[in-house]
């Protein structure tokens, strides 16, 4: 990904490498769009994952390795600009494929636009811009912003209890207020007609207290602001047997969704 901002050892832009990055990105998405063009609305394309960030201009031109000894040197502002250009190119590639045989569905397909690092605060930064749908009649209705939510870090990511930032429980008024204040920032997208997909959220590990309350609040408050949250499975669901591993979690799902007889281990 850092090929988009490649520079030589003296800080001069390596335009040959940068052009190659665009060429590769366009080739990848052209193939994907045409290969799956006849699939229906259950298939959503996403422009990237967490890589649209400082990765597009940092020292690592892949994820962890340099590209032929070259390193990137984009500023943070420039990384935002490149991210916005990549997302716009993504929309154009998919929409332009709709005139190919069996690809008509790509004209109206829902597209997921990767936020900056898929980080909530960085995506709500004014430098991040949603792309323009090149099918004018779609307006904003076929574009959704993609973010991941693991905040606060001590709760969402950390598993080591010896870490000073580890948060082993969730449910205080402060916890609720923080989640609400964060999610309220996302309304800038839903208020302007865009969808919001919280493509990942989680809680470190299942030893923590208050997990059902946390997941419930993400789901219910997320719905209020027009977001669809997708839980990262931190061992609450047994994929082999298709059952929920914790009774209180299953009860919470029944309460929130109205489902009955949620399969329990």
What is the predicted role of each segment?
Residues 1-11:
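Aromatic-lined carbohydrate-binding surfaces of glycoside hydrolases
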Residues 5, 120-121, 206, 239:
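Generic structural signal for helix capping and beta-alpha/helix-loop junctions
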Residues 9-14, 18, 28, 38, ...:
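Mature, structured extracellular domains of secreted fungal proteins
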Residues 14, 18-25, 117, 128, ...:
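Generic hydrophobic, helix-prone segments enriched in Leu/Val/Ile
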Residues 15-22, 76, 80, 169-179, ...:
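Flexible, glycine- and charge-enriched loops at secondary-structure boundaries
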Residues 19-161, 167, 184-203, 224-225:
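Active-site region of glycoside hydrolase catalytic domains
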Residues 46-52, 156-171, 229, 234-248:
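Short secondary-structure transition/capping segments
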Residues 173-264:
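Substrate-binding cleft of secreted/luminal carbohydrate-active enzymes
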């Amino acid at each position: 990904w850092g090929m988009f901002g490649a520079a030589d050892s003296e800080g001069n832009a390596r335009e040959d490498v940068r052009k190659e990055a665009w060429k590769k990105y366009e080739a990848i998405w052209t193939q994907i769009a045409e290969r799956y063009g006849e699939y229906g609305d259950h298939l959503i394309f996403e422009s990237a994952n967490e890589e649209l960030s400082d990765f597009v201009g940092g020292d690592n031109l892949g994820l962890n390795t340099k590209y032929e000894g070259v390193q990137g040197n984009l500023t943070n502002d420039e990384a935002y600009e490149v991210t916005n250009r990549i997302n716009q190119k993504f929309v154009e590639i998919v929409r332009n494929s709709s005139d190919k045989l069996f690809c008509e569905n790509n004209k109206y397909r829902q597209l997921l636009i990767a936020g900056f690092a898929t980080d909530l605060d960085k995506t709500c930064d004014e430098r991040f811009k949603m792309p323009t749908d090149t099918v004018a009649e779609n307006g904003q209705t076929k574009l959704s912003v993609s973010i991941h939510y693991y905040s606060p870090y001590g709760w969402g990511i950390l598993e080591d209890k010896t870490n000073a930032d580890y948060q082993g429980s969730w449910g205080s008024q402060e916890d609720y207020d923080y989640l609400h204040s964060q999610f309220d920032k996302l309304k800038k997208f839903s208020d302007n007609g865009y969808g919001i997909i919280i493509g990942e959220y989680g809680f470190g590990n299942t030893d923590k207290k208050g997990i059902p309350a946390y997941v419930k609040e993400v789901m219910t408050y997320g719905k209020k602001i027009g977001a669809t949250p997708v839980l990262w499975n931190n061992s609450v669901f047994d994929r082999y047997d298709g059952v929920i591993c914790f009774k209180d979690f299953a009860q919470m799902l029944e309460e929130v969704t109205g489902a009955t007889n949620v399969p329990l281990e």
